[in-house]
Amino acid sequence: MARIAGVDLPREKRVEVGLTYIYGIGLPTAQKILARTGVNPETRIRDLSEEEVNRLREVIDKEIKVEGDLRREVSLNIKRLMEIGCYRGLRHRRGLPVRGQRTKTNARTRKGPIKTVGAKRKK
């Protein structure tokens, strides 16, 4: 099992798909990495040579922000928005949708389970 950026990549997957298991690398980024390193995207991870794995590791470490660093940057960005008191920061603080979605109905993912208030009782 190849280990890149602290993530064990699944042996049976194609390299192109396997790289997407790393937080911060999607399919387009994975394709760019493979083009830059000269690794065939159709190759299975189990079939990669040690040299190919090292080339992938080198490009990812030097040029792309992934895993812990990226998570830290995102959380610091959100914290900064909350500190400066902008609209997006207030929405984050209140646990509401940030990007203009409706909240009269829906938005349950962000707001959490329904809190029923004043339900009528049967007499």
UniProtKB/Swiss-Prot annotation:
Q: Which GO terms describe its cellular component?
A: cytosol; small ribosomal subunit
Q: Which GO terms describe its biological process?
A: translation
Q: What molecular functions are annotated in GO for this chain?
A: rRNA binding; structural constituent of ribosome; tRNA binding
- The organism's superkingdom is given as Bacteria
Keywords of this entry: Ribonucleoprotein, Ribosomal protein, RNA-binding, rRNA-binding, tRNA-binding
Annotated S-S bridges:
none
| Chain residue ranges for the region called Disordered | 95-123
Q: Which Pfam families match?
A: Ribosomal_S13
Q: Which family does it belong to?
A: Belongs to the universal ribosomal protein uS13 family.
- Its job: Located at the top of the head of the 30S subunit, it contacts several helices of the 16S rRNA. In the 70S ribosome it contacts the 23S rRNA (bridge B1a) and protein L5 of the 50S subunit (bridge B1b), connecting the 2 subunits; these bridges are implicated in subunit movement. Contacts the tRNAs in the A and P-sites.
User: Which NCBIfam families would you find in this protein's record?
Assistant: uS13_bact (TIGR03631)
Q: How does it assemble?
A: Part of the 30S ribosomal subunit. Forms a loose heterodimer with protein S19. Forms two bridges to the 50S subunit in the 70S ribosome.
Protein name stated in the entry: Small ribosomal subunit protein uS13
Instruction: Give the organism the record lists.
Output: Desulfitobacterium hafniense (strain Y51)
